[in-house]
Amino acid sequence: MSAKPLWYRWARVYFAGSCIIGTGVLCFIYTTPTDEQLIASFSPEIREDYEKNKAYRQREQQELMEIVKKTSQSDEPVWKTGPIGSPLEKEQRNLNQQLIDYNQFEKKRAEEYQREQIDKAQEELLEVEKLAAQAKKGYWWNPFSSK
């Protein structure tokens, strides 16, 4: 029989378990790439597609979070997914699972970009008009002013 006390055996068990868990955590930390490293390892076509659709995915995630908040505030069971069609129910399997219409999203984004460009052009026009007005404004004592 073993003459070692019970606490010693349990201490060994906890130490061994801690070593196993610590090894797993360290392996996870040092082998998992960061988001930047992962994106950098993509091929140029996939990276371009990722960057192009980044805003769309963020908007879709925001829409999903709004649906989750609405669903959590209701008294219905968790498995009722609200406006999202459940793939587990027969009558909802063929429903569109997209939360946001991609074409509408791109159209709205293009309109916002166009509006920004128009605002920027108007600001530049005002600045040019202000500079032109200052150039026209000449003083009689200034021999270098153009009249």
UniProtKB/Swiss-Prot annotation:
Topological relation to the membrane, as annotated: Single-pass membrane protein
InterPro entries recorded: Cbp4 (IPR012420)
Location of this chain's protein in the cell: Mitochondrion inner membrane
Function (record text): Essential for the assembly of ubiquinol-cytochrome c reductase. It has a direct effect on the correct occurrence of the Rieske protein, core 4, core 5 and apocytochrome b.
Protein name: Assembly factor CBP4
Signal peptide span: none
Parts of the chain that traverse the membrane: 13-32
Family membership noted in the UniProt record: Belongs to the CBP4 family.
UniProt keyword terms in alphabetical order: Chaperone, Coiled coil, Membrane, Mitochondrion, Mitochondrion inner membrane, Transmembrane, Transmembrane helix
Organism in which the protein naturally occurs: Scheffersomyces stipitis (strain ATCC 58785 / CBS 6054 / NBRC 10063 / NRRL Y-11545) (Yeast)
Organism domain of life: Eukaryota
GO CC annotations, alphabetized: mitochondrial inner membrane
Gene name per UniProt: CBP4
GO BP of this protein: mitochondrial respiratory chain complex III assembly
UniProt feature coiled coil, ranges: 88-139
